[in-house]
Amino acid sequence: MSINATLLIQIIAFVLLIWFVNKVLWGPLSKLMEDRQKKIADGLSAAEKGKHELELAEQRAKEVLKEAKAQAQNVLSQAEKRGSEIVEDAKIKATEEADRIKAAAQAELEQEVSRAREDLRKEVSTLVVSGAEKILNKEVDAAAHNDMLETLVKSI
């Protein structure tokens, strides 16, 4: 095996080719691959972070919705309670008003009955006095007595 100049030139050319590929192509290519790998890792990290934030936001939304439902239920129950109180107050007031009107009507009726009785007593006593005067002024026989009683009954 003899080493001649061609072999030596080929070895030098091969070494220069490797140095050139390493310097010009391999360095930027490996830097480009590292940058790309870093971008992908950052993207995956951001996606994971976004997924976590989405889960937190969904959980907060559920809590807010649950709180809003509880608040709405509370407002509804208070409104129903207040409505029942208003209806009950109205019933009580209506009952009191009806009782007051009924008592006033009863009192007025009793006054009217008392007045009517008093008027009737006065009229009856006037008629009795008038009848007694007629009886005393006349001598009464049975027929005249019956006539006076009938006249008295008709005038009553």
UniProtKB/Swiss-Prot annotation:
Cellular location(s): Cell inner membrane
TM stretches of this protein: 1-21
Gene3D superfamilies assigned: 6.10.250.1580
Annotated GO CC locations: plasma membrane; proton-transporting ATP synthase complex
Cell membrane keyword on record: yes
Pfam families: ATP-synt_B (PF00430)
Oligomeric and partner information: F-type ATPases have 2 components, F(1) - the catalytic core - and F(0) - the membrane proton channel. F(1) has five subunits: alpha(3), beta(3), gamma(1), delta(1), epsilon(1). F(0) has three main subunits: a(1), b(2) and c(10-14). The alpha and beta chains form an alternating ring which encloses part of the gamma chain. F(1) is attached to F(0) by a central stalk formed by the gamma and epsilon chains, while a peripheral stalk is formed by the delta and b chains.
Protein name per the record: ATP synthase subunit b
Source species of the chain: Hydrogenovibrio crunogenus (strain DSM 25203 / XCL-2) (Thiomicrospira crunogena)
